[in-house]
Amino acid sequence: MEFYPVAIEKLIEEFAKLPGVGYKTAQRLTMHVLNLPKEEVEGFADALKKARGTIKYCSVCGNYTDTDPCAICSNPNRDKSLVCVVEEPKDIISMEKVREFNGVYHVLHGVISPMLGKGPDSIKLRELVSRMNGKVKEVIVATNPNVDGEATAMYISKILKPLGVKVTRIAHGIPVGGDLEYADEVTLAKALEGRREI
């Protein structure tokens, strides 16, 4: 039994394809869009089309960009000898917000995940290796601290160390303001492993 006209059902289905959006949220988004003034809906649709039509991947790092190379890769003030490897373009935004990293990035566009059938050839590892031109001194692996992220980090270390590149991993552990009693064993172990002198 259909509750909505076909056009509304189709819009709900399209919204539900977005990550983290279930059917109920897709319904709410659809109803919100239908209640917007026509000009706002057209502006939203135009912005989607323009972004999809003009945004591409940087040929150097794989980040989203409207110029090639991207603003980070083409910035002469960035340290090109320091490359931070991340899983997705959104991870670059997280790193940049910290304002502590002045190197460049490499986006893998995924991780090695045997459970999902994703091997090393499924992500941008060849491109990473091709960037090791003698000028890169250190690669910081900033994949997520889960099984797939750790497996990917270990694989990157294995393929880059023979090239004479220093490979480091971002530290993991207790968040600032966190209590030890609420930390799980793996987090505590990582915090101990990543300890440093004060």
From Swiss-Prot:
Keyword DNA damage: yes
Entry keywords, A to Z: DNA damage, DNA recombination, DNA repair, Metal-binding, Zinc, Zinc-finger
Domain Toprim positions: 81-175
Pfam families named in the record: RecR_C (PF21175), RecR_HhH (PF21176), RecR_ZnF (PF02132), Toprim_4 (PF13662)
GO molecular function: DNA binding; zinc ion binding
PROSITE patterns per UniProt: RECR, TOPRIM
GO annotation, biological process: DNA recombination; DNA repair
Zinc finger residue ranges, C4-type: 58-73
Function: May play a role in DNA repair. It seems to be involved in an RecBC-independent recombinational process of DNA repair. It may act with RecF and RecO.
Family affiliation: Belongs to the RecR family.
Protein name (Swiss-Prot/TrEMBL): Recombination protein RecR
The species this protein was found in: Clostridium acetobutylicum (strain ATCC 824 / DSM 792 / JCM 1419 / IAM 19013 / LMG 5710 / NBRC 13948 / NRRL B-527 / VKM B-1787 / 2291 / W)
Lineage per the UniProt record: Bacteria, Bacillati, Bacillota, Clostridia, Eubacteriales
